């Protein structure tokens, strides 16, 4: 399981299926050490987290031998500002903001891109509004980026759209980076409502998928290609 998580962290999703399944005996030589963290004991059960460290050169050699590209560079933290369009208004700090709530429910990732969410406190309300975030107000975005100590800000604007004629509903998510190596990069994603799907359900699904795609985009931009190296 630990090795699978390592592969998922480093290798683009499109190439993960090309790797052979490894027996435990093949994985063990790649492990440098492991330790138990966060131990919890009770009279009926024991809970603990295992932290594995792998030997970089052997993992690299395994991936290289199988012709798989991968990324190792960790991104500077990214502050995500989730703006939700509702009845003509743009919501960011308003309560409720279902898009912000959906992002808070996304499980923490051990990937290469640390995503941070705003606290939504008075300092946030003072420093930037939903309209300023969507408009890309450079001065205000720089203020919140510095306060949170991040390398870039990702504004993700979500809105429910209805197709003319068919009345089919979809959640459209437009993202744009400000600052960092991805500055100015934009993307638009559409998530169709399934039958009887609620708005709360689709924003949750969209948040998880966008989080995955943020990781995938970073890996694709930072791939190590061994044909260009001597290592």
Tell where the protein language model's regions lie, with residue ranges:
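Short, well-ordered alpha-helical segments
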Residues: 1-20, 140, 198-217
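Amphipathic beta-strand/beta-sheet edge segments enriched in Tyr/Trp
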Residues: 1, 48, 55-58, 145-204
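A short, hydrophobic beta-strand-centered structural micro-motif
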Residues: 28-40, 81-82, 133-166
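Short beta-strands and strand-coil junctions in structured, solvent-facing domains, enriched
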Residues: 59-61, 88-89, 162-164, 216-224
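Solvent-exposed, acidic/flexible segments
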Residues: 52, 92-96, 134, 138, ...
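Signal peptide-directed extracytoplasmic domains
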Residues: 9-82, 92-98
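C-terminal/domain-edge helix-coil "capping" segments
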Residues: 63-73, 101, 105-114, 147-148, ...
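N-terminal segment of the mature soluble domain
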Residues: 3-17, 76, 81-139, 146-148, ...
């Amino acid at each position: 399981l630990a090795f699978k998580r390592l592969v998922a962290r480093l290798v683009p999703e499109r190439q993960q299926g090309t790797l052979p399944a490894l027996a435990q005996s093949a994985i063990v030589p790649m492990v440098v050490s492991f330790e138990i963290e966060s131990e919890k004991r009770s009279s009926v059960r024991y809970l603990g987290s295992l932290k594995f460290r792998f030997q970089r050169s052997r993992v690299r050699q395994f991936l290289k031998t199988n012709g798989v590209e991968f990324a190792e560079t960790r991104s500077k933290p990214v502050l995500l500002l989730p703006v939700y369009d509702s009845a003509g208004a743009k919501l960011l700090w308003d309560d409720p903001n279902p898009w912000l709530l959906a992002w808070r429910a996304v499980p923490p990732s051990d990937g290469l891109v640390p995503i941070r969410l705003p606290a939504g406190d008075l300092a946030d309300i003072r420093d930037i509004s939903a309209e300023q975030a969507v408009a890309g107000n450079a001065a205000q975005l720089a203020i919140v980026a510095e306060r949170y100590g991040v390398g870039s800000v990702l504004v993700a604007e979500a809105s429910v759209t209805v197709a003319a004629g068919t009345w089919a509903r979809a959640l459209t998510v437009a993202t744009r980076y400000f600052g960092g190596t991805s500055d100015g990069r934009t993307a638009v994603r559409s998530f169709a409502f399934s039958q009887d799907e609620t708005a709360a359900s689709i924003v949750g699904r969209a948040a998880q998928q966008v989080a995955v795609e943020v990781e995938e985009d970073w890996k694709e931009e930072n791939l190590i290609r061994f044909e260009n190296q001597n290592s």
